[in-house]
From Swiss-Prot:
GO biological process: histidyl-tRNA aminoacylation
Catalysed reaction equations from the record: tRNA(His) + L-histidine + ATP = L-histidyl-tRNA(His) + AMP + diphosphate + H(+)
Domain of life: Bacteria
Subunit structure of this chain's protein: Homodimer.
The entry's keywords: Aminoacyl-tRNA synthetase, ATP-binding, Cytoplasm, Ligase, Nucleotide-binding, Protein biosynthesis
Protein name in UniProt: Histidine--tRNA ligase
Similarity remark: Belongs to the class-II aminoacyl-tRNA synthetase family.
Compartments, record wording: Cytoplasm
Pfam families in the cross-refs: HGTP_anticodon, tRNA-synt_His
Record InterPro entries: aa-tRNA-synth_II, aa-tRNA-synth_II/BPL/LPL, Anticodon-bd, Anticodon-bd_dom_sf, His-tRNA-ligase, HisRS-like_core, HisRS/HisZ, HisRS_anticodon
Protein EC: 6.1.1.21
NCBIfam families xrefs: hisS
Length: 424
């Protein structure tokens, strides 16, 4: 017997019971995006490696440790996308979507990072991201945060997520802070772990979100990023906070909040949860006004976010399981008798025409009534339609409520109206 081939470690199959949950959640997210006027863009999974090195930064963990990079048969270095913003910016430049224009875009799909697989984190994972180009005020930053807050309300998880905000200022202000932070860390190297010592000179702001408790205690005495902000960044951040206050969106200013990718400036934010064990980030983003120019386009203000769908699905399942309790099948059509199968399929097609969106499954493969009702139970159907030879002859169908056990014979011409009443 040939050896079974298994899925690659960290790359998960999503089976039918799971995909129904994902579709329900994704549908909710997409509806909210549409209500704000955002348009979908579909991007390649594979990009040229220099795109990510230039966008993300060569001394980030993503580029140094986590990217899936390979040479194709032409000798070109290609990478499975580890995130979506760089590809979205590349597409915007390539197709002339950005300069002197306003764009509100969203995308969804798999991303790839060679990380240690754990609950809610895989090597192939799925992100939904939104990017806005051509707007530089704090009002669009606020709109993106309001959009995400509307998601949480629609999914019933608002009480289980909290918003953290920060401003990391302009590139110049951050460079000044970087020098002050490095000088401080150099005086306390004995407290730093090896990872922080490495980051101290390559990407020192990443030391701020170290999970090491000794390092976190040390950082209480470190220079504060907020003290180094330029006046424009202070004004921008104050404007954002004022808009969120007016909208009733609670937040915490976390001066240690930085993002792991080099392209961010000014606003950064994260929605975090404590409802999945240790604190985890559900959605994160910020402003990246220099990235379009960095990738070869003309200077264009930009802001966006990305959300990991695996973690979001886990959170909805944990705190609001009723949201995803949707049956696979609403109606199961039971047909018994040599002459009934054709009539059953004709009736099923007519009901699908008359009741768009109904989940109706027709029995196939024969079987007596007992076996067919067992199949209806397996699919957790709410209603069974029973069509025997006598029903075919007199143009009726038996409608049975599988929850209450009540049943009634209904003319086939009026069964759709009867079913709408039962299904609500």
């Amino acid at each position: 017997m040939a050896k079974n081939i298994q899925a690659i470690r960290g790359m998960k199959d999503y089976l039918p019971g799971e995909t129904a949950i994902w579709q329900r959640i994704e549908g909710t997210l997409k509806n909210v995006l549409g209500s704000y006027g955002y348009s979908e863009i579909r991007l390649p999974i594979v990009e040229q490696t220099p795109l990510f090195k230039r966008a993300i930064g060569e001394v980030t963990d993503v580029v140094e440790k986590e990217m899936y990079t390979f040479e194709d048969r032409n000798g070109d270095s290609l990478t499975l996308r580890p995130e979506g913003t760089a590809g979205c910016v590349r597409a915007g430049i390539e197709h002339g979507l950005l300069y002197n224009q306003e764009q509100r875009l969203w995308y969804i799909g798999p991303m790839f990072r060679h990380e240690r697989p754990q609950k809610g984190r895989y090597r192939q994972f799925h992100q939904l991201g939104a990017e806005v180009f051509g707007l530089q005020g704090p009002d669009i930053d606020a709109e993106l945060i309001m959009l995400t807050a509307r998601w949480w309300r629609a999914l019933g998880i608002s009480e289980h997520v909290s918003l953290e905000l920060n401003s990391i200022g302009s590139l110049e202000a951050r460079a000044n802070y970087r020098d002050a932070l490095v000088a401080f860390l150099e005086q306390h190297q004995e407290t730093l772990d090896e990872d922080c010592k490495r980051r101290m000179y390559t990407n020192p702001l990443r030391v701020l979100d170290s999970k090491n408790p000794d390092v976190q205690a040390l950082l209480n005495d470190a220079p504060a990023l907020g003290d180094y902000l330029d006046d424009d960044s202070r004004e921008h951040f104050a404007g954002l906070c004022k808009l969120l206050d007016a909208a009733g969106i609670a937040y915490t200013v976390n001066q240690r909040l930085v993002r792991g990718l080099d392209y961010y400036n000014r606003t950064v934010f994260e929605w975090v949860t404590n409802s999945l064990g240790s604190q985890g980030t559900v959605c994160a983003g910020g402003r990246y006004d220099g990235l379009v120019e960095q990738l070869g386009g003309r200077a264009t203000p930009a802001v966006g976010f990305a959300m990991g769908l695996e973690r979001l699905v886990l959170l909805v399942q944990a705190v609001n399981p009723e949201f995803i309790a949707s049956p696979v099948v609403d109606i199961y059509l039971v047909a018994a008798g040599a002459q009934t199968q054709s009539a059953a399929m004709t009736l099923a097609e007519r009901l699908r025409d008359e009741m768009p969106g109904v989940k109706l499954m027709t029995n196939h493969g024969g079987g007596n009534f007992k076996k067919q009702f067992a199949r209806a139970d397996k699919w957790d159907a709410r209603i069974a339609l029973v069509l025997g030879e006598s029903e075919v002859a007199d143009g009726t169908v038996v409608v049975k409520d599988l929850r209450s056990g009540e049943q009634t014979a209904v003319a086939q011409d009026s069964v759709a109206a009867h079913l709408r009443t039962l299904l609500g």
